[in-house]
Amino acid sequence: MSEIREAFDLKIVTEALEEPHIDLIERHGDVIQIGARNMQNFSLLRRAGRSQLPVLLKRGMAATLEEWLLAAEYIMAEGNYNVILCERGVRTFSQHTRNTLDLASVPAIRRISHLPVIVDPSHGTGSAYMVTPLARAGVAVGADGLMVEVHNDPELALSDAAQALTPSQYTQLVREVRAIHEVTTPIANESRLETKVA
């Protein structure tokens, strides 16, 4: 990972499943990811809170917004305030998607928290054809960023092949969300500022 990071000037986001993984990420990565299944792994959250690296905290599959924010508090209570929230879909009764991307959580979080929130339309749907429309929607409702699966040849991907975009699809997605961002950012920021004043 360190070689790739240096060769291509990339930032590395890596998921920690156990506390010792954080030691490795601190040496070779740039951001610690806490996945949905570990959102309430409190010892892992506390260890991430003692790190100097930013932490990307994915929402648990059945977590309320309050539970998600309280998980972030575990990290911040240890001194690490560099927490990024990631909406990645919740479990519902829907069978046409892998998960249900809760886009309403984005403006809700922006209203009650200072933390940045990004959207993962890849895991939020599990289907590549839905990623771009939901990425556009995520940016439109005020997401601070996106997490998108991309692979040169999705059919050969070792994981998450069904939800991965090709590089050309990703390039088109970026064009589209940048246009939406230009229009919606002033509105989203105004909403966040109004909340802070109120």
Model-predicted regions and their roles:
Residues 1-29, 41-44:
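N-terminal active-site wall of soluble small-molecule enzyme domains
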Residues 1-12, 47-54, 103-118, 163-187:
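Alpha-helix-loop-beta-strand connector modules within alpha/beta enzyme cores
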Residues 12-15, 30-34, 55-59, 83-87, ...:
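Hydrophobic faces of well-ordered beta-strands that scaffold small-molecule active sites
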Residues 20-28, 65-71, 126-144, 152, ...:
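Catalytic cores of alpha/beta
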Residues 24-33, 49-55, 76-82, 113-116, ...:
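Glycine-enriched alpha-helix->loop->beta-strand junction motifs that scaffold or abut catalytic
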Residues 37-104:
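Conserved anion-binding
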Residues 76-141:
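Active-site/ligand-binding-proximal alpha/beta "capping" segment
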